[in-house]
Amino acid sequence: MKKTLAALIVGAFAASAANAAVVYNNEGTKVELGGRVSIIAEQSTSNRKDQKHQHGSLRNQGSRFNIKVTHNLGDGYYALGYYETRFINKDIDGNEKNIGSGFGSITTKLAYAGLGNKELGEATFGLQKTIADKISTAEDKEYGVIEKNSYIPTEGNAIAYTYKGIEGLTLGASYVFGGRNFSDYEITDGKVSNAVQVGAKYDANNIVAGFAYGRTNYKAQQAKTQQVNGALATLGYHFDDLGLLISLDSGYAKTKNKADKHEKRYFVSPGFQYELMEDTNLYGNLKYERINSVDQGEKVREHAVLFGIDHKLHKQVLTYIEGAYARTRTNDKGKTEKTEKEKSVGVGLRVYF
């Protein structure tokens, strides 16, 4: 029997969560371990500042380990804790760098705790994903062309509330704190000072719909503030008989910058996911994004396209081929138009545990 696309998405694209192993379950306490080892072989070419760069690599692609602990408190209440690691490469000054094999030092990606109730929702505290992370439907494994963080932060050190009391519906709200340096306890220029966001996502009855709004304050130079008011939206429909999902993702943001130019930006991104055969899926999306400088007349336009195909060799083994191409044109008042191009193709393997 042919699988529905919704089942494929849960089974193939979220395998790490679905296949988490329960290592302890006694007297209301459950401990689950999960994660994946993920490798990609890629070839990339970029043309920036009139220089062409080309390189191939074999590197880590988001390998991780996570542990989740849940305690049943009775009367429908529970407490939870979650911890997830990543690998990170750093230079001699401790700055993160996307270089080498990608298997550097182990670092904390997510770490939070909380209290919840099946009917009332869940409150969590710590380093975690926000509701904005859910507001897109387009699929990708590595070269995602949609950069949601430019509109609303998708993770951070936050207080969050999530409600899932209605089947298929997720409601979320969060307040994100700024990260301070250990040396002087100040927020680094360009980093989030604080942010607030609300959103909702519905995925049931063949319909996908979501919306999020956020207001984010960034630390700018000379102790000034940069404020971004952003919105993200997604809409999709499952054609189960065809094994097809079509979607449209979009975003809009307005930046008020007391230290520099103001900006407006938006993007639209139609996409699809199609079941070629059992355990084999084709996916892709296009993106058009535009950024306008309100004060100085600078305009940036980006066209991007992504296609990929994945195949499950086993319920815990996924292979894929993915490629992306992006072209960015920058028009600055009184200057010659600049064009930058970037293309990448990769072959990946994920082994979940």
UniProtKB/Swiss-Prot annotation:
Which first-to-last residue range defines the signal peptide?
A: 1-20
> Which Gene Ontology biological process is one annotated for this entry?
monoatomic ion transport
In which domain of life is the source organism classified?
A: Bacteria
* GO cellular component term, pick one: pore complex
Pfam families recorded: Porin_4
Where in or outside the cell it occurs: the entry states: Cell outer membrane
Entry keyword set: Cell outer membrane, Ion transport, Membrane, Porin, Signal, Transmembrane, Transmembrane beta strand, Transport
Q: What is its main location?
A: membrane
State the InterPro entries in the record: Gram-neg_bact_OMP (IPR050298), Gram_neg_porin_domain (IPR033900), Porin_dom_sf (IPR023614)
- Which topology term describes how it sits in the membrane? Multi-pass membrane protein
Gene Ontology terms for molecular function = porin activity
User: What functional role does this protein have?
Assistant: Forms pores that allow passive diffusion of small molecules across the outer membrane.
Complex and partners: Homotrimer.
Family as reported in the entry's similarity comment: Belongs to the Gram-negative porin family.
**Descriptive protein name:** Outer membrane protein P2
Gene of this entry: ompP2
